[in-house]
Amino acid sequence: MEAGSRNCHDALARIGLDPALTLRALARRQGGAGSAAVEAFIRERFAARYGARVRHFMPTLLQLEDDAGVRHGAVGVRSAARESLFLERYLDRPVETEIARTSGFSPARERIVEVGNLAAKGAGHARLLIVALTSLLVAQGFDWVVFTGTPEVLNSFSRLDLGTLPLGEADPARMGDELADWGSYYDSHPMVMAGNIRLGHERLVSLGVYRQLAHQPLYAVTERQDFAVA
């Protein structure tokens, strides 16, 4: 059984109806069996889908688990405030410059967060992760999310009616010696994408998506979480 950690203090939200799932955070810098198990889940999903060997993980991982502790999805986050982002290897300029070029906005770097390591048992679980994460990142004070999206991932955003902006192609030539680890991943021609988190959040509210998915945040709307800024 793919069981997650059951520490009640890391529970961030409840979402879903059948079954109801809990979003939990695990800071990798703290180590422990919980983060190792989530890393293993991500590795297994990428290996099964692309024949890839995932070696890089975000500083903080989040997971969706049911009440029996069975893991249904996972994702990683990294703030742009203190370090370069994984996906910036694909860009010719800093991510905030590329967002400004594409969107017309001028975001502060510390208000940008990278999402990656997305792995789920099914497309429905991926959408639950996206919805729960949108609410959480708004509460953290982030304005823009950036990610490398395959057609499958982009379809999840489209199904949720969340707009995204292309920043450029995720060129496999930028991976250097690491390219051999990624199997068939780049065959799908992934793109570097950006999304305005607050506009996305407002869209989910107006469409009633949070209500339909029984989303229940376990943090105050104005409460800034610390885990994603490491």
What do the predicted segments below correspond to?
Residues 88-177, 190:
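Acyl-donor binding region in acyl/amide transferases
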Residues 26-110, 199-200, 228-230:
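A conserved beta-strand-loop-helix scaffold within acyl/acetyltransferase catalytic domains
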Residues 168-215:
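Accessory, usually C-terminal, subdomains that scaffold auxiliary metal cofactors
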Residues 74-76, 159, 207:
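Structured alpha-helical
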Residues 210-230:
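Short, cationic low-complexity segments
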Residues 66, 119-122, 197:
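Short, flexible loop/turn elements at secondary-structure junctions
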Residues 1-33, 213-214:
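Conserved N-terminal entry element of GNAT/NAT acetyltransferase domains
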Residues 118, 187, 222-223:
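Intrinsically disordered, low-complexity linear regions
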